[in-house]
From Swiss-Prot:
Belongs to the RuBisCO large chain family. Type I subfamily. The modification N6-carboxylysine is found at residue 193. The lineage of its organism: Bacteria, Pseudomonadati, Pseudomonadota, Gammaproteobacteria, Thiotrichales. The record marks 326 as: Transition state stabilizer. This is Ribulose bisphosphate carboxylase large chain 1. It comes from the Bacteria. Substrate binds at residues 115, 165, 169, 287, 319, 371.
Length: 472
């Protein structure tokens, strides 16, 4: 006897609200912060999110009879209050692993943050966290090389690495750009960097920039004996152009290239990560456009999710905020996504906004890059917050030194070494940072003038995207 079905519309919660469900190790788990339209029950909205991000649609369809809907559907299994906000709640949803293409972060994000984010029954929705099951993690390529391989490749141990974004970011000729790179590397930096919007403009075509930067690297290395690099931005208008730039960087001997992973796209990023893995190039990732996606505390995608996504898609470095600089960043949240980038296993920790355990297995970690409005006075806090496996990247805080780029670079290295030594001696470097730098400044007029130049520069604005009250 043929099966029949009841045509029409029924409430989502009849099918997708399952508070008795116990998530499996193989499930994807997602936590959404949801603000429903007035009068819509929480259970109905949570179920609607589960449906619209998995198997459901607005009406019953006869083709449901052709599959095992109970197996493939997403399940809203828990609801929690958001303390301090009566209008919002957390919806926890489990998805079977078979809903997603292996190794495709694009597949995951298309489902979880696709049409459901435009659903009329929602005033706003934000993806706060995802638990990627280990079985899925193992299908992803991840970072091309990882932290230890980079340490060995660059021969840098026992301290954070130092970088600098060349300024002004736009307008320099390739020759003058290369000159700035040389001065910074000669002064003691480990890396210099293209800014996110440096690609191939009329005033500086990419091939010219690559050549002048590589000349600067080789000249500085000959003088100092130190291995250094410049993040050559391979981001381009098409994947074909991106690969051409990466290939040229490899041919001229560059150790590292760069990609804007959000504006460039996840497909392009994963492809470039695979290329870098096969060809021995490190991959630096800029997060341009993240503020559009993650800064609104009620709508979008939290940066901790973007950090997981990038680690799985592939990158050896990722800009991660600074806490102390000019860019948005809550300390607890920052510490949470720094752990997500580097550690093999991250336990649920609501004090850092981490909603699920996350196991990355043997996947290498990503080096967090502190960049944006930082200068020498921030060095003690940066070393304390980020630790050794990081890049501390001073753009204006290097090139803005009154005595020039090379001196600015040398000053940052002096300050870094002073802070690392003090930390290794057991000092509380955040608490004693001013004293540590002032004492070193007595023996370094270059450091002293830098401290004088930036002593009044602070970025003390309230954080827009704070951890929810219950997490503190």
């Amino acid at each position: 006897m043929a099966k029949t079905y009841n045509a029409g519309v029924k409430e989502y919660r009849e099918t997708y609200w399952m508070p008795e469900y116990e998530p499996k190790d193989s499930d994807f788990l997602a936590c959404f912060k949801v603000v429903p339209q007035p009068g819509v029950p929480r259970e109905e909205i949570a179920a609607a999110v589960a449906a619209e991000s998995s198997t459901g649609t607005w009406t019953t369809v006869w083709t449901d009879l052709l599959t095992d809907l109970d197996y493939y559907k997403g399940r809203a299994y828990r609801i929690e209050d958001v303390p301090g906000d009566d209008s919002a709640f957390y919806a926890f949803i489990a998805y079977p692993i078979d809903l997603f293409e292996e190794g495709s972060i694009v597949s995951v994000m298309t489902s979880l943050v696709g049409n459901v984010f435009g659903f009329k029954a929602l005033r706003s929705i934000r993806l706060e966290d995802i638990r990627f099951p280990l079985a899925y993690v193992m299908t992803c390529g991840g970072p091309p090389h990882g932290i230890q391989v980079e340490r060995d490749k660059m021969d840098k141990y026992g301290r954070p690495m130092l970088g600098c974004t060349i300024k002004p970011k736009l307008g320099l000729s390739a020759k003058n750009y290369g000159r700035a790179v040389y001065e910074c590397l000669r002064g003691g930096l480990d890396f210099t960097k293209d800014d996110e919007n440096v690609t191939s403009q009329p005033f500086m075509r990419w091939r010219d920039r690559f050549l002048f930067c590589q000349d600067a690297i080789e000249k500085a290395q000959d003088e100092t004996g130190e291995r250094t690099g410049h993040y050559l931005n391979a981001t381009a208008g098409t994947p074909e152009e991106m690969y051409e730039r990466a290939e040229f960087a490899k041919e001229i001997g560059s150790p590292i290239v760069m990609h804007d992973f959000l504006t460039g796209g996840l497909t392009a990023n994963t492809g470039l990560a695979n290329y870098c893995r096969k060809n021995g190039l490190l991959l630096h990732i800029h997060r341009a456009m993240h503020g559009v996606i993650d800064r609104n505390p009620l709508h979008g995608i939290h940066f901790r999710v973007l950090s997981k996504v990038l680690r799985l898609s592939g990158g050896d470095h990722l800009h991660s905020g600074t806490v102390v600089g000019k860019l948005e960043g809550d300390r607890g949240s920052d510490l949470g996504w720094i752990d997500i980038m580097r550690d093999s296993f991250i336990a649920e920790d609501r004090s850092r906004g981490i909603m699920f355990d996350q196991d990355f297995g043997e996947m290498p970690g990503v080096i967090p890059v502190a960049s944006g409005g930082i200068h020498v006075w921030h060095m003690p806090a940066l070393v304390a917050i980020f630790g050794d496996d990081s890049v501390l990247q001073f753009g204006g805080g290097t090139i803005g030194h009154p005595w020039g780029n090379a001196v600015g670079a040398a000053v940052n290295l002096v300050a870094l070494e002073a802070c690392v030594q003090a930390r290794n001696e057991g000092q509380e470097i955040e608490k004693n940072g001013k004293e540590i730098l002032t004492n070193d400044g007595k023996h370094s007029p270059e450091l002293k003038i830098a401290m004088e130049t930036w002593k009044e520069i602070k970025f003390e604005f309230d954080t827009v995207d704070k951890l929810d009250l219950s997490h503190k």
